[in-house]
Amino acid sequence: MGQKVNPNGFRYGITKAHNSVWYADKMQFASHLLEDQKIYDFFDKKVRQLQIGNVQIKRNQNGLILIYVYTAKPAVMLGTNGENIKNLTKDLQKILKNKKANISIQVIELKKPDLNARLLAEDIAIKLENRGSFRLAQKFAIKAALKAGAKGIKTSVSGRLNGVDMARTEGYNEGEMKLHTLRQDVDYAATTAKTTYGILGVKVWVSLGEILSDEQKAKQEEMDLLNAPKDRRVRRGGERHASTKKN
């Protein structure tokens, strides 16, 4: 059987940037790593409430923890006069067990949330929990992603679908999805839907096209110009027609 690697981890350091960016010595590395995991787990629980698509963590030498939160609803994330940010900062300090932790949360708006695999997967999971059709939920997500400009999308739902005794997996695939091509910008997310029949697994792959360097872009533009159809010029007197011979 083929072993399927996580598309995000497969591309980190090549076409995708790491979510955690900092440097630490051997004495601090383990503690920083544990803190990052606690921060990610904290925001994972608030994905549906705040429509969080991605979280990135950066640290500087002064001990400042910069947390970039990409959300589809920045107004809900900020709250009135930034009250939600203050509350989130206090909650993080409690989780990290450090009331003096210097934490700065930066909210960034997702311009196209329908291209974010995490938000699409959560949307499918919410519909499944509300007893919606797993087929329609996937089709709506595919339609929304393609309309937003995705080159391709793949979805998968596994578990006791419709409450049957035998668990199975059903999914849809539309457009291009080159998982083996590292130049292909693929966003992947997996989540779970808690239904009365049990837990269903939801996976979403979104392809945003290939990431090309400047040289590759120039070559691609040249090829597009060469392959472009030439304008058909009509000669004077109109187009030529097949002449009929007179008997």
UniProtKB/Swiss-Prot annotation:
Q: Which residues are listed as membrane-spanning?
A: none
This entry carries the following GO cellular component terms, namely: cytosolic small ribosomal subunit
Stored SMART domains:
KH
An annotated GO BP:
translation
Q: Where is the KH type-2 domain?
A: 39-111
Q: Looking at the record, which segments are called Disordered?
A: 221-247
Pfam families recorded = KH_2, Ribosomal_S3_C
- For bias type Basic and acidic residues, the affected ranges are 236-247
Per its record, what are the GO molecular function terms? mRNA binding; rRNA binding; structural constituent of ribosome
InterPro entries (alphabetical): KH_dom (IPR004087), KH_dom-like_a/b (IPR015946), KH_dom_type_2 (IPR004044), KH_sf_prok-type (IPR009019), Ribosomal_S3_C_sf (IPR036419), Ribosomal_uS3_bac-typ (IPR005704), Ribosomal_uS3_C (IPR001351), Ribosomal_uS3_CS (IPR018280)
**Coiled-coil segments on the chain, per record:** none
Q: Which UniProt keywords apply?
A: Ribonucleoprotein, Ribosomal protein, RNA-binding, rRNA-binding
Its family remark reads:
Belongs to the universal ribosomal protein uS3 family.
What HAMAP family does the annotation carry?
Ribosomal_uS3_B
Per UniProt, subunit arrangement is: Part of the 30S ribosomal subunit. Forms a tight complex with proteins S10 and S14.
The free-text function statement in the UniProt record for this protein reads: Binds the lower part of the 30S subunit head. Binds mRNA in the 70S ribosome, positioning it for translation.
Query: What is the name attached to this protein's record?
Result: Small ribosomal subunit protein uS3
Q: Which organism is it from?
A: Metamycoplasma arthritidis (strain 158L3-1) (Mycoplasma arthritidis)
